[in-house]
Amino acid sequence: MISGPILDARGLQAVAGLLERPIHAVDVGCREGVPERWRTLGAGATLVGFDADSDECARLNAAAISTQERYEPIALSDSEGTATLYLTADPQSASLYPPNLDAVRRHPELARHEPHGTVTVATTTLDRWAESAHAAPIDILKIDVQGAELNVLRGAQASLPAVRALELEVEFQPLYAGQPLFADVDIFLREHDFVLWRLRDLAHCGLTHSRRDERAFPVGDAVEKTRIGGQISWGNAIYVRAELGDPDSARPWQTSARDACVAAVLDLPELTLLALERAAAGTSGEPRRILARELQRARARANSRRLHGLFWEAPRHVRGFVGARARPRQAG
């Protein structure tokens, strides 16, 4: 049984090697480092992380195994200036918004949000940083800043037109006082020509009176049916540029090849196949040979995953080349 992205590390690096410039992936709120899956792009990517914790960035820079991976000790928001950073029991829960103490009281899982003081930090915007650093256009933007994701997006409006996909932590309940919620983020991104593609890692918080063994705090796409799920509280949202999911959208083969890498890194199999097919059809010579080879390999991996019921019923425009003999996933 095959698991993982349908375009593996070898395939990713082969396709990325055809691009006119490396994939540029940015992680805002990068404590503990950029996602490991980004590193599978190898020399085909430049990876930049941002975090307000200068000590953490120094540690990550010292541990980086490639000069194409670096960390900036910068707090990003929607303006230049200073802001209050609210510290919490768990350093990963620090935010530019104060913890919602009512939520902490109701949900024992949020004890990590207990206030532990404040510090003043300098802030800037992603757009201002990109301009001053002469940064390449951003292809993948990941934001996990504990309720301040919309602030970062508002400070990135000049950068967003180049972005092909975003991965954001979103809250469905106010875990921080005054924070924007999922609906606010969704409206903003739709206004900027992105569509919601997938929700992942949905976290549900139980109430104070729930028994410990009935409190669900899952990582994955669903709450186990045998458990009390509690209230949906937060998760990760994957957004893609609207044209990525449009089988009738025409774009240069270089753009489609870039989209294939982006979709594969985010483990979006149907978009990976669609982009590979478009890229292969749009070029000739050695690039076409490489793309056709990786498309064939990706189809085989997709077919195996579908046979084992791991992820999807192929959409209509992909179904014809995924494999006519594959059985649809059984309900149940």
Regions found by a protein language model. Give the residues of each.
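Phosphate/nucleotide-binding beta-alpha loop and adjacent structural elements of enzyme active sites
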Residues: 1-332
